[in-house]
Amino acid sequence: MWKLLPAAGPAGGEPYRLLTGVEYVVGRKNCAILIENDQSISRNHAVLTANFSVTNLSQTDEIPVLTLKDNSKYGTFVNEEKMQNGFSRTLKSGDGITFGVFGSKFRIEYEPLVACSSCLDVSGKTALNQAILQLGGFTVNNWTEECTHLVMVSVKVTIKTICALICGRPIVKPEYFTEFLKAVESKKQPPQIESFYPPLDEPSIGSKNVDLSGRQERKQIFKGKTFIFLNAKQHKKLSSAVVFGGGEARLITEENEEEHNFFLAPGTCVVDTGITNSQTLIPDCQKKWIQSIMDMLQRQGLRPIPEAEIGLAVIFMTTKNYCDPQGHPSTGLKTTTPGPSLSQGVSVDEKLMPSAPVNTTTYVADTESEQADTWDLSERPKEIKVSKMEQKFRMLSQDAPTVKESCKTSSNNNSMVSNTLAKMRIPNYQLSPTKLPSINKSKDRASQQQQTNSIRNYFQPSTKKRERDEENQEMSSCKSARIETSCSLLEQTQPATPSLWKNKEQHLSENEPVDTNSDNNLFTDTDLKSIVKNSASKSHAAEKLRSNKKREMDDVAIEDEVLEQLFKDTKPELEIDVKVQKQEEDVNVRKRPRMDIETNDTFSDEAVPESSKISQENEIGKKRELKEDSLWSAKEISNNDKLQDDSEMLPKKLLLTEFRSLVIKNSTSRNPSGINDDYGQLKNFKKFKKVTYPGAGKLPHIIGGSDLIAHHARKNTELEEWLRQEMEVQNQHAKEESLADDLFRYNPYLKRRR
């Protein structure tokens, strides 16, 4: 801002502040700069104008250009040098100007005005820029040593606030410059800056009495201290505040790493990077290096300095409670603050050890990631021995819902067979963290837990279908648990199980460690396919029979649903093509499809027990019954087909009935002889025709359109004039006749009053 200060002579009084874009006339009457007691001053002696010569108003090294134009009679002198009349000259700060010859001397000075705004909205910045521009100043976004004011609506602990306090610059509201501009335009005293201090809005400080005025103590607040920054972003943000406060700021990285004694030197403050904060993006290698430095400081009884302590040390003008590595951390601090603000949150977080990451998702082998009810806070081994898996599977089978004692042994054998089958096909297990029911709980609670676990594990939403190898593939514990549970539930739904299945189970349970490459395997793939076919057909038949009866208990219904889903899941995994054959039984009509049961089982020449022979005979009897039923159903189907073929034939001779209206018709409207009644052997032929109605052949004659002519009521002026004249003539004759009658009327019989 340019100012014209009176130095000596008649021109005394207050200085004149010059706004940009305004012409100030110097004279003795009716002008902006008035010099009265000098006879050598002309009425329009000279003109002062201040304007910006650059378009970029953010360049603080450029100031408005002040020009002086002489229009006087006795002359104007700049630094005792007379100007030419009618010419302009550029003035500099400190130049002396003399108007006239009687010693009216002035001095030109430029007062810098560079305002830095913080936490202002768009409208506030626009109004501030306009006011500062008229006052001849600049507005900048980043704090520098040239800044003279910090403009804020409310004081928050930011980097700009810290730098302004250290440099001793005032913090004012935006309204200060608006009022200042009004005072200059009205030639009044500028407003008091103390009345425009913004309020303190910082939760970490609270209602403490804080002096935010320019204090000399803050200029050397960090003298003798060296702040070590381990992050380049922090160094760029906070180094200027440390340097303004008389301290030294250094950036230490892995490339230029110093010795450990450097970090332990007195007066050295290591700034906390806040690696525990999830918002800071730091590479893992750099995190390890930073963590090693933090551990070294802890071993020596030192602590890192949070970012917020730098700002609080400047505000309270002390480094005893703040920025002291050997002192205790003060309450109400936060280790790091995102962005330029140092006060966007207030919480105590001084622990340097990174907390264990909380994984809210657990990954099950060969499945998609899903939400789990528990947190996985520790690493678990990926491979576990087969013996441990067997124990867990047996525990699951023991905790299953209670069945009759006769079925318990078969369910245990089924679990053994499923385990050995998993061993033959899958050499390695991948254990995933799943929920196991407790053994010590009651049986009812265990059954509910297993049902809920089976539903959660088996009815999972999957977005992808993965291709699986036929031979070399890994099976998770969930899949093996599915096989075991399916076999156990099969035993529950099958009261009469073939003894061949039990014999094979017992034989395999005795010889569990079976090699996949051995040629003497008793449990081959063909056996597995045939057995699972029989079990699947029987299980589905049992389910259909249950659906016809009344609903039993809720637990049995849940088991049936789980069993049905298990068979759907085990089909692609074990590569077994189960052909489900449905059997429907009704009271009146029995219809069964043809069933071809072929068992190509190859067994060894070992002795078969009597129980197995009896079961084989029962199966042969069942096959015969099924064949007879299939023949009976085939006969019924053939008879039904014949009836359907006969019913498809339509009647040939029909009586055609027509409904006629009682209206006289033209002879040409309808020709009944033209109707063809002989349609041959056509099926579904339309043997009717729409009945005509009167007027169907042609449109009725409607009066309209061109038949109608619009009637326009035109006035005949000649006829009207003639009629008017005739009326006037008749009226005139009537008047004349009435006058004549009055003259010659004589009434001899007068009525006299008595």
Curated annotation (Swiss-Prot):
Component of the MRN complex, which plays a central role in double-strand break (DSB) repair, DNA recombination, maintenance of telomere integrity and meiosis. The MRN complex is involved in the repair of DNA double-strand breaks (DSBs) via homologous recombination (HR), an error-free mechanism which primarily occurs during S and G2 phases. The complex (1) mediates the end resection of damaged DNA, which generates proper single-stranded DNA, a key initial steps in HR, and is (2) required for the recruitment of other repair factors and efficient activation of ATM and ATR upon DNA damage. InterPro entries: BRCT_dom (IPR001357), BRCT_dom_sf (IPR036420), FHA_dom (IPR000253), Nibrin-rel (IPR040227), Nibrin_BRCT2 (IPR032429), Nibrin_BRCT2_sf (IPR043014), Nibrin_C (IPR013908), Nibrin_met (IPR016592). It comes from Homo sapiens (Human). Residues 328-346, 430-440, 447-462 have a biased composition (Polar residues). Residues 24-83 form the FHA domain. There is a cross-link at residues 529, 571, 582 (Glycyl lysine isopeptide (Lys-Gly) (interchain with G-Cter in SUMO2)). Induction: Up-regulated by ionizing radiation (IR). Ubiquitous. Expressed at high levels in testis. Residues 105-181, 224-315 form the BRCT domain. Residues 111-328 are annotated as: Mediates interaction with SP100. The modification Phosphoserine is found at residues 278, 343, 347, 397, 432, 509, 518, 615, 673. Changing residue 247 to R: Abolished recruitment to DNA damage sites. Keywords: Cell cycle, Chromosome, Disease variant, DNA damage, DNA repair, Host-virus interaction, Isopeptide bond, Meiosis, Nucleus, Phosphoprotein, Telomere, Ubl conjugation. The gene is NBN. The modification N6-lactoyllysine is found at residue 388. A motif (Nuclear localization signal) lies at residues 461-467. There is a cross-link at residues 435, 686, 690, 735 (Glycyl lysine isopeptide (Lys-Gly) (interchain with G-Cter in ubiquitin)). The FHA and BRCT domains specifically recognize and bind phosphorylated proteins. Residues 326-346, 396-415, 430-478 are annotated as: Disordered. The modification Phosphothreonine is found at residues 337, 402. This is Nibrin. Phosphorylated by ATM in response of ionizing radiation, and such phosphorylation is responsible intra-S phase checkpoint control and telomere maintenance. Phosphorylated at Ser-432 by CDK2 in S/G2 phases abolishes interaction with TERF2, enabling DCLRE1B/Apollo recruitment to telomeres. Phosphorylation at Ser-432 in response to dysfunctional telomeres promotes non-homologous end joining repair at telomeres, while dephosphorylation by PPP1CA promotes microhomology-mediated end-joining (MMEJ) repair. Ubiquitinated at Lys-435 via 'Lys-6'-linked ubiquitin chains by RNF8, promoting NBN recruitment to DNA double-strand breaks (DSBs). Ubiquitinated at Lys-686 and Lys-689 via 'Lys-63'-linked ubiquitin chains by PELI1: ubiquitination takes place following PELI1 phosphorylation and promotes ATM activation and DNA repair. Ubiquitinated at Lys-735 via 'Lys-63'-linked ubiquitin chains by the SCF(SKP2) complex: ubiquitination takes place following SKP2 phosphorylation and promotes ATM activation and DNA repair. Changing residue 160 to M: Decreased ability to recognize and bind phosphorylated proteins, such as MDC1. In RRHK mutant; abolished ability to recognize and bind phosphorylated proteins, such as RBBP8. GO terms for cellular component: BRCA1-C complex; chromosomal region; chromosome, telomeric region; cytosol; Golgi apparatus; Mre11 complex; nuclear inclusion body; nucleolus.
